[in-house]
Amino acid sequence: MATTWPPCRIIRKSGGLRGMWTLEYELQRSGLGPVAGVDEVGRGACAGPLVVAACVLGPGRLEESLDDSKKLSAKGREMLFPLICRYALAYHVVFIPSVEVDRHGVQVANIEGMRRAVAGLSVRPGYVLSDGFRVPGLSVPSLPVVGGDAVVACIAAASVLAKVSRDRLMVAMDADYPGYGFAAHKGYCTRAHSLALTQLGPCPEHRYSFINVRRIVTRSNTRAVAGFTPAPPAEHGECR
C-alpha cells in the first residue's frame, strides 16, 4: 500500500512557535531531510518585484527569534537577516521583475519563483515546505503549510530573507524613481501611492496587469517612462 509522506502524525505534532522545529525534525528523522522552507513577499504590491526565498536551517538555530516576517519590526528583521545568512546551511533569493509578473500573472510567477529558489540552493533538499499553497514541478517531495511562516522555522527564515531583500530594493528604487514614495510603502497600494500614480503616471517598475494601475493609465492616457512598453497582462490583480 502506498505511503503518504509526511505521515499525519508529523503534521499533528507541529504547530505554534514551540513546535517550530517539530515538522522539520520529524521529516529529518524519517530520512527526508534536509528540509527547505520557501516563502514569498510582494504578491499584493502593484510595483516592484515579487521576491522568493528558500532556506535550509541547521538544527536548533534561531528558533526563539524567528516568526512570520510580517509580524516582526523592520529592525527585528534587519537584525535577523545576517544571522540567518550566517547560520543557514543554504539559502537562495530570487527576484521576479514586474514585467514578468505582468506577462505570466502573479500566481504563475510565484510558483516559478519558488521553483527557482529551491533549485538555487547549494544544498539539495530532501523535502520542501512551502507557505500556504502547493508548488508543482519541484524535483523533491513538498508540502504546503497554511500559515507556515508563523509555525515552521525554515519557512519563517525564508520569509525574513525575502522581506528584507525586497524592502532594501524598494528603498533603492525610491532614488531611481523619486516621487512615488517606494521607500515608505514598498510598492503597496497606499493612499499616498495612489495619489502619486495619478499625478505622475506609472514607471517601469509598476505592474500594468494590476487593475488600479491600468485604470489610471486608461483614465489619464498616461505613458510610462519613454522607451518602456509594458508586456500584455496574463491576468488581472489589484493591490491588497
From Swiss-Prot:
InterPro entries in UniProt: RNase_HII (IPR022898), RNase_HII/HIII (IPR001352), RNase_HII/HIII_dom (IPR024567), RNaseH-like_sf (IPR012337), RNaseH_sf (IPR036397)
Enzyme Commission no: 3.1.26.4
GO BP term (any one): mismatch repair
Domain (RNase H type-2) ranges: 33-222
Co-factor remark: Manganese or magnesium. Binds 1 divalent metal ion per monomer in the absence of substrate. May bind a second metal ion after substrate binding.
Gene Ontology terms: cellular component: cytoplasm; ribonuclease H2 complex
Essential cofactor(s): Mn(2+); Mg(2+)
GO molecular function, one term: manganese ion binding
Reaction catalyzed: Endonucleolytic cleavage to 5'-phosphomonoester
Function: Endonuclease that specifically degrades the RNA of RNA-DNA hybrids.
NCBIfam families: PRK00015.1-3, PRK00015.2-2, PRK00015.2-4
HAMAP family: RNase_HII_B
Record-given protein name: Ribonuclease HII
Organism: Mycobacterium leprae (strain TN)
Encoding gene, per UniProt annotation: rnhB
